[in-house]
Amino acid sequence: MQFIDQARIMVYAGRGGDGIVAFRREKYVPAGGPSGGDGGRGGNVIFEADSNLQTLLDFKYKRIFYAEDGNRGGPNRCSGVSGSNLVIKVPCGTEVRHLGSGILLGDLTEPSQQLMIAFGGRGGLGNAHYLSNRNRVPEKFTLGREGEEWPLQLELKLLAEVGIIGLPNAGKSTLIGNLSAAKPKIADYPFTTLIPNLGAVYRPNGDSIIFADIPGLILGAANGAGLGYDFLRHIERTRLLVHLIDSSAKDLVHDLIVVEGELIAYGHGLADRPRIVVLSKIELLSGEELHQFSQALRMVSGCKILVISSAILSSIEFLKTQIWQQLGT
């Protein structure tokens, strides 16, 4: 499935139905009074979070949405039928913003959560409303009002509690595959991960936590370089970041600084998020090199440095333990 996490759409609530002019027509009542009914209200536009959806792909093919118009009024003071509401399903984690101003209108994070986004127009009044002592045969009625219309920006931010970050080829996809049952694409070239990978990892109490592996960050990612910037929004909701560093890289400290700098440049509090720094692929290092590199990274990051090998199960389990401790579980 193609992963689409942004969409621009236009929504139109329904127009209210018109009121009508009508008079009572009954036998032996030659001068029946006004009986024109009111128009029905236009349908509203409502967003609803759906846990079965994972992407905004549907909005690539349909971008304009209309709720149903209200029906015109009827004789005998009968009101027109209101237009049906239009319910638009979106994935959990979708933010809805006004396209022009960027103002956040709603954040749909829970299954079945709804957001009323555009109200239908009021129905017009029938001539029955305009009967008075001075006007016993009113011909006046009003038209239904137009419904609200909004240009909208939809943004999907994945609901993951732990984000795995690092430069391209740091081993993030391998790690999330070992931590969970996720099966990400893995190969020895940059940007193997072209979309965020999600994996559910089970805690000791049996509950699961969602991990997200986003495409690798490079220098300038916060300004649009590479692939990372488009997906940094997906770790905005995380409680913890796992920063993975490839021990076979030429300059580990430089790699650490690059990613830390991009978190600062991106903003949204990512640089202040609790994190664990992990040195991966340690099977390639001697004991002395491992100690040296760990010390250097600790001095720059101020964090405890964990060392793991994806080939050694015990190191993966140790990392899980550290993550649970950080999350308070």
Swiss-Prot record:
InterPro entries recorded: G_OBG, GTP-bd, GTP-bd_Obg/CgtA, GTP1_OBG_dom, GTP1_OBG_dom_sf, OBG_GTPase, P-loop_NTPase
Q: Name one GO cellular component term.
A: organellar chromatophore
Domain Obg stretches? 1-159
Subcellular location, principal: plastid
Please state where this protein is localized.
Answer: Plastid, Organellar chromatophore
> EC number(s) for this protein?
3.6.5.-
Q: Which UniProt keywords apply?
A: GTP-binding, Hydrolase, Magnesium, Metal-binding, Nucleotide-binding, Organellar chromatophore, Plastid
Q: Which domain of life is it from?
A: Eukaryota
Q: Name one GO molecular function term.
A: GTPase activity
Q: Top EC class per UniProt? A: hydrolase
Give the protein's cofactors.
Mg(2+)
A Pfam family it matches: GTP1_OBG
Q: Which residues form the OBG-type G domain?
A: 160-328
Annotated PANTHER family: DEVELOPMENTALLY REGULATED GTP-BINDING PROTEIN-RELATED (PTHR11702), MITOCHONDRIAL RIBOSOME-ASSOCIATED GTPASE 2 (PTHR11702:SF31)
Give the family from UniProt.
Answer: Belongs to the TRAFAC class OBG-HflX-like GTPase superfamily. OBG GTPase family.
What job does this protein perform?
Answer: An essential GTPase which binds GTP, GDP and possibly (p)ppGpp with moderate affinity, with high nucleotide exchange rates and a fairly low GTP hydrolysis rate.
Spell out the HAMAP family in the cross-references: GTPase_Obg
Subunit composition and interactions: Monomer.
Annotated protein name in UniProt: Putative GTPase Obg
The taxonomic lineage of its organism, from the top, reads: Eukaryota, Sar, Rhizaria, Cercozoa, Imbricatea
